[in-house]
Amino acid sequence: MTLSATQIQAIVDATKTPTPEQVRVVEAPRRPLLVVAGAGSGKTETMSMRVLWLLANHPDVTPASILGLTFTRKAAGELGDRLRERIRLLSRELPQLSERLDEDPVTLTYNSFAERIVSEHGMRIGIDPDFSMLSEAGALDLMTQIVEAWPTDLDDDLSPAGVVGRILHLAGEIAEHGYTVESARQALEGFGRELEIVGDSNEAARDLHQANQRRIAFLGPIEVYQKRKREMGLLDFSDQLVLATRIVREVPSVRAALREEFRAVLLDEFQDTSVIQMELLSTLFGDHAVTAVGDPNQAIYGWRGASASSLETFLERFQTGAPEEGQTLTLSTAWRNDVSILEAANRVAEPLREVASYQAGKEQLNAQSPVLVPRPGAGRGVVEIAYPAAYEDALAATVDFVRRVRAQPVTDGKRRTVAVLSRRRKDFPLIDAALREAGIPTEIVGLGGLLDQPAVQDVRAALELGYDVAASPWLARLLAGIDLGAADLIALGDWARFLARAEGLNPHQAVLLDAVDRPPTPGWAD
């Protein structure tokens, strides 16, 4: 007996009917499949239904043989909960399958999956199975030791803490892009030779040349950092991916065992996978029952190695033969928004679908985000636009909008909630203060929130200074809190530079804390 997507939907939730797009995704053959899903298009529910369809129609697939990968622990937990709930419903309605469905699917972050491969199979490439994970704080401490002992200045324009942060960031970028220190050196030196041909004709060219030279200088500490980690039996997050990729590439038996263990694989937020993650997954699960879900319009991790071509090259990387019809599908029904809101969103996103000038004449991209269409029965909705000239008027318009929405009648006795989005994080406290002043309770979601409160900022300033005495902006915050005026702070800055010159240092390396510890005599003037 073969169950269709519509029949399975009726079993788990008879109030919903899958769209034709969802049916095509759910019932797709067991082969590499790319699903380009717009925002709010029900991708998680559709992926859950695909898992149920595979379980109901393929006896060799069990819940434990389903692998779901995503980027955060929270997302992995939510995906696991959704799958377990749906599997329980299917098992209850189809008793003949209950014994085979008495297991849980495996949902992990991409990094956790790599860590599992290394911990279980690392010995096959000479990795000690008792390795320890290096935390972010541990990485900072280790790199700080290396930088402080480095025989030459690595960057005159940055504080020691700034240098450490930049070097660790570059180390992560090298790993995420699949480079070694040596191959990165060759690439950067080659780029440097190209820059020499261009010359220092303008400020942008000079800045680019300087940045490239800085990266080359940072490679030395990175090389020592990696050596120290090996000697101490430590791995960081980037190491997990590099070593896991090496294992599946060099040990065919591991690759075969993992493919046998996981008969079906779901790759969530695939547009944000990095070069090294793509290499790991395509090496391991090429020509396998892999469903990758993503949306190029929601790519957010390009700064840390995410490949812009992840969606475009999915079938090329995961399939040896030519792609067939039906291997790239879309989900375009937006279940969250009314018609006018979708019209505005599609208009804003329209430039993202245009072919860039450097791609002119090439084949149209086949992994573009779909134009969203409203759900059946969607209302017209309302889009209001305010464009005040003054910032204070913009805040007032925001408060007025939130107040009007919260005043609308509701049926469940609860006030309507409102989300306020801002392009700039520094606007959060101002928006928050304006809403609170109007008597509207608020919560700042994500980073910030409590950390932005003045008292907490003062505590953080003291801690930052305890870690890095050169963190002058944090000291300036504390000094401003004891009623020192702008003229006083300027005078302290001048005195700090005077002390630096007296010690034979570059004035740009002046430390404001030195000026506070050894203040100038009354009447001093530079």
Where are these regions (language model features)?
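Accessory N-terminal region flanking or inserted into the helicase ATPase core
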Residues: M1-V36, S41, E45-T46, L52, ...
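ATPase/helicase motor core of nucleic-acid motors
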Residues: T152, R317, A378-G381, A407-D526
